[in-house]
From Swiss-Prot:
Protein family according to the UniProt entry: Belongs to the kappa-casein family.
Site location (Cleavage): 72-73
Modified residues (Phosphothreonine): 112
An annotated GO cellular component: extracellular space
Protein name (record): Kappa-casein
Principal subcellular localization: secreted
Tissue-wise expression: Mammary gland specific. Secreted in milk.
Lineage: superkingdom: Eukaryota
Length: 136
């Protein structure tokens, strides 16, 4: 025990567990009504099948369901794979026209034919050239 340096307004009571078999009535938790063992046994069977209707203090002899608190449950993040993102378009007309660079892919097919008696089985080569133009 620590030495007290002033007046102590709290009562010093020994801590006794509610389910202590050596103390029939703990200091701070006295049962409201005495029930027969048959009723207690019936309540234990019902507590496994019927959820409790209130979150108030229940008798300590009832078997309780393990209900984890929400802070201990992991909630996966929402997945938006099915939805495609729609870009936002500024609908306010501005006074100055803006130039947007556009990139177009131009394909040119070049077939190289040589004067040879062999048969060429390879497909013609395809070259892709990027052309960038600015539209005003």
């Amino acid at each position: 025990r620590y030495p007290s340096y002033g007046l102590n307004y709290y009562q010093q009571k020994p801590v006794a567990l509610i389910n202590n078999q050596f103390l029939p009535y703990p200091y701070y938790a006295k049962p409201a009504a005495v029930r027969s063992p048959a009723q207690i046994l019936q309540w234990q069977v019902l507590s496994n099948t019927v959820p409790a209707k209130s979150c108030q203090a229940q008798p300590t002899t009832m078997a309780r369901h393990p209900h984890p608190h929400l802070s201990f449950m992991a909630i996966p993040p929402k997945k938006n794979q099915d939805k495609t993102e729609i870009p936002t378009i500024n609908t306010i007309a501005s006074g100055e026209p803006t130039s947007t660079p556009t990139t177009e892919a131009v394909e040119s097919t070049v077939a190289t034919l040589e004067a040879s008696p062999e048969v060429i089985e390879s497909p013609p080569e395809i070259n892709t050239v990027q052309v960038t133009s600015t539209a005003v």
